[in-house]
Amino acid sequence: MRSKVTGAKRWVVKIGSALLTADGKGLDRGAMAVWVEQMVALREAGVELVLVSSGAVAAGMSQLGWTKRPSAMNELQAAASLGQMRLVQAWESSFGEHGKHTAQILLTHDDLSDRKRYLNARSTLRTLVDLGVVPVINENDTVVTDEIRFGDNDTLAALVANLVEADLLVILTDRDGMFDADPRNNPEAQLIYEARADDPSLDAVAGGTGGALGRGGMQTKLRAARLAARSGAHTIIIGGRIERVLDRLKAGERLGTLLSPERGMLAARKQWLAGHLQTRGTLVLDAGAVQALRQANKSLLPVGVKTVQGSFRRGEMVVCVGPDGVEVARGLANYSALEAQKIIGQSSEAIESILGYSAEPELVHRDNLVLV
């Protein structure tokens, strides 16, 4: 299983705020230098590398003399705008000592939700990697709104792994990995070395929240691993305080928790759909429709839909759930929620007589649908 790590050619590495700051007292240049040494070694070993770096808000808080992460959006954005410049300067300076360059990429959810912007971002990232530049990615905290937040950089890293078709996502954290119990309370807790990302038993052991400087706890890291798995990437959740951890991962040491995907790489359009987190509504399917999607790779027809929830327009993303409420798929709707309400449970031939026109015979076409 660890051959999936040593043989991975394209890595996305996510480093959290706690690993880049000196106990909340600004950026830790010494720690950043050690990370850079390891990432440069990966590049020289032929690994294509994309860095997702937290730390902008924490760096800005330090500059402003704040010791507690603010909850108000305007204060967070002010700290991010101040700290982002210092964060990028620090990475560029450190990589520059090894003759490498970095490029700043700031993303919002809209950049990945829009197909054209998604493709432009992917093209830019691939070009930078081909040029030997290390892209440094962060959420564009300064302009983002609650409605289009990724929520945490673990999720952003997973979507970037999807975007660049990475083989491996490395999420560096303040824990050594995922444990079968909370090691802070249970000295008998055992590290989970390997598991399937979709293993439901992991949910019970992924409790807890992020630290004072960051947003993501173990639950968000598990969720990120599952997002990355949709595009065929493996994920390592591993302690960032383990000495030379990236070097040792590349050498094949059995460290951290390796979460593996159920399926292989999806086609490019399906990758975009799988990583499209902003959903506008829900379609509740009957058992026959669930079977048609899962076993026969069929489109979703109106006759197989029992209920429409939410408000969405034609072309927006909807979630498809079975009678038990479990998500089956997600895809782009051919009809608005109002139109869908009128045609569900009906045959495709009846659409025109009900609506006065027929855009498509399917509610969601299979080319715009991805199983989850």
Swiss-Prot record:
Residues 280-358 form the PUA domain. Pfam families: AA_kinase, PUA. Gene3D superfamilies: Acetylglutamate kinase-like, PUA domain. One of its GO terms (cellular component) is cytosol. The keyword Amino-acid biosynthesis applies. GO terms for biological process: L-proline biosynthetic process. Substrate binds at residues 54, 141, 153. Keywords: Amino-acid biosynthesis, ATP-binding, Cytoplasm, Kinase, Nucleotide-binding, Proline biosynthesis, Transferase. InterPro entries: AceGlu_kinase-like_sf (IPR036393), Asp/Glu/Uridylate_kinase (IPR001048), G5K_ProB (IPR041739), Glu/AcGlu_kinase (IPR001057), Glu_5kinase (IPR011529), Glu_5kinase/COase_Synthase (IPR005715), Glutamate_5-kinase_CS (IPR019797), PUA (IPR002478). It catalyses: L-glutamate + ATP = L-glutamyl 5-phosphate + ADP. Its EC number is 2.7.2.11. One of its GO terms (molecular function) is ATP binding. Pathway: Amino-acid biosynthesis; L-proline biosynthesis; L-glutamate 5-semialdehyde from L-glutamate: step 1/2. It is found in: Cytoplasm. ATP binds at residues 14, 173-174. Catalyzes the transfer of a phosphate group to glutamate to form L-glutamate 5-phosphate. Belongs to the glutamate 5-kinase family. This is Glutamate 5-kinase. It comes from Pseudomonas putida (strain ATCC 47054 / DSM 6125 / CFBP 8728 / NCIMB 11950 / KT2440).
